[in-house]
Regions:
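C-terminal accessory domains/tails appended to large, multi-domain proteins
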Residues: 764-945
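Leucine-rich, amphipathic alpha-helical/linker segments
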Residues: 640-683
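Phosphate-moiety recognition in structured ligand-binding domains
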Residues: 700-703, 710, 719-722, 728-741, ...
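Polar/charged alpha-helical tracts
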Residues: 62, 81-84, 138, 593, ...
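P-loop NTPase motor module signature
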Residues: 2-652, 686, 714, 718-721, ...
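Accessory helical subdomains and C-terminal extensions of nucleic-acid helicases
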Residues: 670-727, 731
Length: 945
């Protein structure tokens, strides 16, 4: 589509690998790294030097960095004439606005009946059907006589849950809400729904039973449904089935069990707010405290007041079952014992003592502490000293000395390597599972182990990460040949999402990558944090699945005593925009009042930030009511910004490529990163991007070229040559079609044909695509600062310094012709990174931007984006914004009746806007040499993901 990408040959080696990064050179006397100052300065003089330099930068930027807005004279004249014609034919602006609002109100009043009917509950109300009851009973009785069913039943009877069958049925029948807890392997997920269903069928009431069991992950919903169907000697889709996004094998309407993702049940609420088609709702894995499950818990608690016949069962790990019981009015709790062998726990002090590790690497040596972390390190050691002294006489002086300078801020991969070698040479057979925080540690440890001649030939090393090819990871479930030890390097995905049965040894490094939201800085963060006790227990449990095991915790027993009981609930560490739109579309009242009913309510500050963001996005009015745009965004299975983007794509006739962008942003890009091939993957991305300098358009080119390869029956080779996942691309294809179906049902497009010419007249127009991406991502805007047209650093409204993420195609790029960028997310990890970036020109910012102020020769948007513009053009742009907003209000407020609401002149105006967007040019102001510190470089720092 853009900048044709020629396929390279097959995959080769990585070559020399990544370079050593930017060499910062020397430091000024007493100065910090990257903050040098002239020699000879002392004390106050140093501060004055930096203050003068800061003032000089600001003065220069104010004088030179305003980019001029430019529209050619002919286009200006056309726009003025069209705007004038519109004002003559439609009357005063307030009358036009009243007309638009009337149409929108009429549209929205009838809209709810058209969507939200993709339910999981089947019939709206369960009513007794004697004939069906008898049929279900006879079917179950006949099936129970089969050899296949009896074989499965023998297995089921060995599960701890089955031994409590009568007790479980009794407590569910006697109580409206029950909490059932049990460790992995107890059988609660597969058995409890069957106990309920079989009890109803055997009592001749099968027609009154419909069990819906939510799962936090897609793969869990599928695998559990298929397992339950097998245990019932049936095909999936008979009495047990599943429903996940883009895939459904639903069971019969009555006398059945449906396993679905939590999001699917929330979607059902739009068409069936009382879930009348369900007799029992089971929330599984509630201890994970994901956002959607906590949200659904609030709804179910309220729903119990109007559904006296509904039964709610919450299933949890044992560690915090009491919390959910308290939330639901001290409802009964049942605990199912798990199947687990004893697991010995060894702490850091034990490991150091056992293997004689001295800690002589940069990970643990005091000299390896960065100056920024020095105080934190010293405080950490001071806190631990009483514990270290308590070990005197129990451990060697060598161990105590090592502990007294141990750096907990890092993962000591030398120690992990040494411990693995110790296990491989001295311990009985059994797989080793190593828990690491992220990609960087997995990659580095994998490299070290592969280079270890002592392990070569006698070990099978399997890195496990979402960025890696799944074909290699399938080995994780297979037992290796005799004499070969399996070593799995994984993130927290191996805590609950997968089970590796032959693991005997677990090495827990004690850290986990957690996404959080810094309310004060309005910034997402991704940092390595200490695990919770819940995480630690889950990790320990991986070692005792099939025989006694050992869990090596590479942190002290004192550190364990400081761990939190569980990780912070997702509702307290994420943005709330999507949740607020759900509250509004379900008519649940004030967002703040509703969320105050949560188990752990979010802060009022976090809620206010999200409300203001939705108001800026024009999804909510100031009184917190849904706008027509907000109504549509709430209906779409996308975050608000991406949802707005695809709506704008339907208006600007560039549907196909923008659907690809939306699918990739809401799921993931299709690239897989084999260990050792990181640089080759980066090069492939840049080839796909061509000269577009856009991470988003790069994704468009990947998908469109894959489609072409598939048509030529060359898809697999294309994926292999370019480090792409066929499964991910197929998922993106299905998501694109789903988005088109939603747009069709919302009447933004007349058919579901993504490729139809009428929806893609501007799909090959790069600048229109950039503008539409801007329309969705605003206010996520960054300003680039350049030297020799090379991007040196970025700034945002709230961050003086931000860097492009190393995975961006724009890292180290030159030749930019605009200083403005839009980005999808901003995350602070090792530094503040901008993810998924596209350059954008001034006109899209002016059209889609926020608060507009014109003074002198300057236009200011949202009090920080400044553009240079003469008075006449500024007035034209102001009028253009007003008329363009009215077009959007009409198209979004009543998409199904566009022909009657959009005049010929307004269509002319939209065409003229597209012409202006297509021909706009800009320039990049250069910064002077003294404007940058030495660390103002887009250094490729590998972010740990």
């Amino acid at each position: 589509m853009f900048a044709r990408h020629e396929r390279r040959g097959g995959r080769g080696g990585r070559g020399s690998g990544r370079g050593s990064g930017w060499n910062r050179g020397g430091q000024g006397r007493g100065g910090r790294p990257g903050s040098s100052f002239p020699a000879g300065l002392r004390g106050k003089e140093i501060g004055l030097y930096f203050a003068r330099r800061g003032r000089a930068r600001k003065e220069w930027a104010a004088a030179h960095q305003k980019v001029a807005v430019s529209i050619d004279p002919e286009s200006q004249q056309d726009l003025q004439q069209i705007i004038h014609s519109i004002s003559l034919e439609e009357g005063p602006s307030h009358e036009r606005l009243d007309s638009i609002n009337a149409v929108a109100v009429e549209y929205l009043s009838s809209a709810p009946t058209r969507l939200g009917t993709r339910g999981v509950g089947g019939e709206l109300k369960l009513e007794r059907n004697a004939a069906l009851d008898e049929k279900l009973y006879q079917s179950l009785e006949a099936k129970a006589q089969s050899r296949e069913y009896q074989s499965m039943l023998d297995f089921r009877k060995k599960l701890p849950a089955y031994t409590m069958r009568e007790q479980i049925i009794e407590v569910i029948e006697s109580n409206r809400v029950v909490v059932i807890s049990g460790e992995t392997g107890s059988g609660k997920t597969t058995q409890v729904p069957q106990f309920i269903l079989d009890s109803y069928i055997q009592k001749g009431m099968g027609s009154l039973c419909k069990v819906i069991c939510t799962q936090p992950r897609r793969i869990s919903a599928i695998s559990v449904a298929e397992r339950v169907a097998a245990e019932r000697a049936e095909q999936c889709g008979d009495s047990a089935g599943y429903h996940i996004r883009l895939e459904c094998r639903a069971p019969r309407d009555r006398g059945s069990i449906l396993f679905c993702t939590t999001g699917i049940l929330l979607q059902q609420l739009q068409g069936d707010p009382y879930i009348m088609g369900a007799s029992h709702i089971i929330l599984d894995e509630v201890h994970e405290r994901d956002l959607q499950t906590d949200f659904l818990s609030i709804i179910l608690k309220d729903l119990l007041a109007v559904r006296p016949d509904l039964r709610v069962i919450l299933m949890s790990a044992t560690i915090n079952a009491e919390l959910f019981s308290d939330y639901f009015g001290n409802c009964p709790r049942l605990e199912i014992p798990g199947i687990a062998f004893p697991v010995e726990v060894a702490y850091l002090e034990d490991v150091l003592e056992q293997i004689g590790y001295r800690g002589n690497s940069v990970y643990s040596r005091n000299a390896g502490i960065h100056w920024k972390d020095r105080k934190k390190f010293e405080s950490m050691i001071q806190d631990a000293m009483p514990f270290i002294r308590s070990l005197e006489g129990k451990y060697s002086h060598r161990t105590l000395d090592t502990l007294s300078e141990w750096n907990e801020l890092c993962i000591d991969l030398d120690l992990v390597h040494a411990l693995i070698s110790e296990i491989c040479t001295k311990k009985p057979e059994g797989a080793i599972l190593v828990f690491l925080p992220g990609w960087e540690q997995i990659s580095e440890l994998n490299k070290r182990l592969k280079a270890d001649s002592g392990l070569r030939g006698s070990s099978l090393i399997i890195p496990l990460h979402s960025m890696m090819p799944t074909v290699n990871q399938r080995q994780v479930f297979d037992r290796p040949p005799s004499g070969v030890r399996k070593i799995v390097l994984a993130t927290n995905i191996a805590e609950t999402s997968i089970t590796i049965n032959d693991v005997v040894y677990v090495i827990d490094c004690g850290k986990i990558k957690m996404s959080n939201f810094d309310v004060d800085k309005n910034l997402a963060t991704l940092d390595a944090e200490w695990v919770s006790m819940a995480n630690a227990q889950q990790r320990k449990g991986r070692a005792g699945r099939v025989q006694p095991g050992v869990c090596y915790r590479l942190y002290t027993s004192w550190r364990e005593s400081q761990l939190e009981a569980y990780q912070l609930p997702e509702m307290l560490r994420t943005r709330l925009e999507t949740l607020i739109l759900k509250i509004k579309i379900l008519k649940l009242g004030s967002a703040e009042a509703f969320l105050q009913k949560a188990i752990n309510p979010p802060s009022s500050e976090a809620l206010h930030l999200s409300l203001q963001f939705l108001i800026t996005l024009k999804a909510l009015n100031e009184d917190e009511t849904l706008t027509p745009l907000g109504y549509h965004l709430a209906k779409l299975p996308l975050d608000p910004q991406t949802g707005k983007m695809i709506i704008m794509a339907s208006i600007f006739s560039c549907l196909d490529p923008i659907l690809t962008v939306a699918a990739s942003l809401s799921f993931k890009d299709a690239f897989m990163v084999p260990l050792g091939k990181e640089r080759l993957v980066d090069e492939a991305k840049k080839r796909f991007a061509g000269n577009t300098k856009s991470d988003h358009i790069m994704l468009v080119n990947v998908f469109s070229q894959w489609e072409e390869a598939v048509k030529k029956r060359d898809g697999n080779e294309f994926c292999y040559a370019n480090y792409l996942s066929w499964n991910t691309l197929k998922m993106l294809s299905n998501m694109r079609q789903q988005f088109a179906e939603y747009l069709h049902e919302l009447n933004f497009i007349g058919s579901q044909d993504i490729k139809a010419r009428e929806y893609n007249q501007n799909s090959d127009n790069l600048k229109v695509l950039q503008a539409v991406i801007c329309s969705g991502l605003y206010p996520n805007v960054a300003k680039g600062q350049f030297k020799n047209k090379r991007l040196v650093r970025c700034s945002t409204k709230t961050d003086a310094k931000a860097a492009l993420h190393p995975k961006s195609v724009n890292v180290s790029q030159c030749g930019f012709d605009t200083q403005w960028f839009v980005y999808y997310t901003k995350i602070r990890s090792t530094k503040t990174f901008l993810h998924d970036v596209t350059p954008v020109y001034p006109i899209p910012l002016l059209l889609f931007g926020g608060f507009f102020r014109h003074s002198g020769d300057t236009i200011t948007l949202d009090d920080w984006i400044t553009l240079q513009c003469d008075d006449n053009l500024a007035e034209l742009i102001k009028d253009l914004r007003q008329e363009f907003d009215r077009i959007l209000e009409r198209k979004i407020g009543a998409p199904g009746i566009l022909a009657g609401t959009i005049s010929a002149n307004q269509r002319r105006l939209l065409a003229a806007i597209i012409k202006v967007l297509s021909t706009e040019t800009a320039f990049v102001p250069e910064m002077p040499d003294n404007a940058f510190d030495e660390d103002d470089m887009d250094v490729q720092v590998i972010d740990e993901t």
